[in-house]
């Protein structure tokens, strides 16, 4: 790509005459919604950029905002030394890339330069030894074509602007229920801020005076600020984008609030109106700015030295080139050094990883299938289920299936006697029904009394802590109790955790509940119908069973396993729960699906459609606790004789399965010191130890999403790195089930993958830093200290095993589909969004032919050809 092309790309967006909301919506593509940390949902930080090639987005992000979307070269070289990258794939990727480029120089010259860049992280000192080098570089400069905020060119003012925004955002977005809240919050962020800012003591008298006559309408204020700052129409989108990326966490919270309120950009207009209004007030005395408008020029001396040193070009050769030829060479070298070499190393790493996975699947030891399956278990696709499923299948005549952990139920849930509801489905799915826990009224009343008594202590403590006068007395009153609590939690965490759980359970004594499965009128507050109609009950059960290929040969016992986690003193607890259930445990959904599948009316209708569930088959609900790899029973209805035998056999096997799965998992955690003597006890200690920063690895290490029959991967040690979604193409002649998997679970898997990827490659920006120095703020998220951006990603401890070693491999998700090639072609032709992800390199796609076993690679991040099958993988 030439320098001239770069200039055109960054200035081609003509915004003149477009409505303000459209401009804000366009700028908002640069950020992603940020959910409150209490229901942590993996977010794809670049979901608005998927219309661009991954490499082009990385180029723009680095040039304009200084954000790297690739791992540093040291990470690639370390992976190479460990055998995680095959150098053959590096060379193969280089040749493929060169074949597709319009090169500004002869092929052999470009190849020498690029290969040198690939294998050297710095230009050697001797390359700068030519005396005329500096003189040649002086007249040739490159600079990033960026539209930067006015305030960013005034360093101290930029810091003050961020401090002001953090202060006001903390006040407005607070959900902690504090005693003192921001007045007039109900009128919106801009209105509440506008009425108070004129008395803000952190602003000088002159700065407060500048707000005199400032618009009270947010739309007028944003337009007025852009005008006063002198932003040209064609630069407005880029200017707003830069402001959103200055504090992407708080801006992401504004996006989430807007979406929750049903207003796509209203909250962002509020946010930007406040930010740009403050910016003008702080920068007004310095306007207009003179000098470089779009940032500092970049020195090209290292690039020039590289050309001379690695290609053999001489100063005389350089002088004979025309100016545009010099620019083209420098732009080529600059882009390859900053972006393309990283991209080729990343692709080579991904190719190596895929080749290893292909070999493992192709050479697997085929486990003998049991003559009669005792139990079938439905697990979430979560990568943490893979080791547990593998050990369970080896322990007896048990089959496992994988599906999204919400079990295809678009519901919001309300636990017994609660005013709160939770959307227990993926963030990309809108709830259509509400399911409630219910119990006899005579049992609910005493339960409410006991529960409220237990909560009263916590609420009183919180209110006293937030009260001006009571807060002074609190340390004296609570000191002895908190001292004992601290001692117990620190010296005997396992014992203390058991005592606290037992006490809570004993005091509350929650009655046995049933579920509101059957339809009746909608709720007054949410408008959603409570329960499901008979047709909906049948459809949801059928849809899941068909999708995972479980339509016949039912075992006497079918276990529906949600999953959750147990940790202590962990702000990121919800990040370890089920993402498909909106960041909470999947127990509720498991109970609902099992109950639906046991309904005689549902089974009768399913039988009419060819899905015959035997009378002896019973569905039961369980929960896989990933922190301790334990299966806990949630609801076990009366069992048939055959189901009871299967149940007893499964229970007997679970102890060893848990021990083996924990042993495998504990060995990956740092500071365990090899294989622990009692892996179950070690896992349980980590779950209740409030000083433990890594109770488990979560979904770190995820790299692939497999869609196909379990028989293809059964017995393969996938190391807890692969999402496993059951699918049988033979039960899906129209491809509808595959399309649902791609649109739902696979998309969520991609979000999770890119959340971990971003937190690994740009931890300072997309991660959340050191877990031990974080502060929970406003009940919505975490900050570093008491005045930072709202941190949107994962803590450093979630992706690294030490300060010098990554645990998570930053690879883009590989989706593998077991289906004939025409299924994949149909999917790509009908699903333009998924096709765009593949074409532009935001995920990778391969397929396995179910008849021949051939492994086929689809798509290419440079050629944009969905049908390319190259790189030698699967041939």
Curated annotation (Swiss-Prot):
Subcellular location: Cell membrane
Binding-site positions, Zn(2+): 380, 382, 563, 578
Keyword Lyase: no
Any Pfam family hit: DabA
Topology versus the membrane: Peripheral membrane protein
Transmembrane segments: none
A GO molecular function held by the record: zinc ion binding
InterPro entries referenced in this protein's UniProt entry, alphabetically: DabA
Keyword field: Cell membrane, Membrane, Metal-binding, Transport, Zinc
One GO CC annotation: plasma membrane
Functional note: Part of an energy-coupled inorganic carbon pump.
Family per similarity comment: Belongs to the inorganic carbon transporter (TC 9.A.2) DabA family.
Subunit structure: Forms a complex with DabB.
Descriptive protein name: Probable inorganic carbon transporter subunit DabA
Annotated source species: Geobacillus thermodenitrificans (strain NG80-2)
Taxonomic placement: Bacteria, Bacillati, Bacillota, Bacilli, Bacillales
Gene: dabA
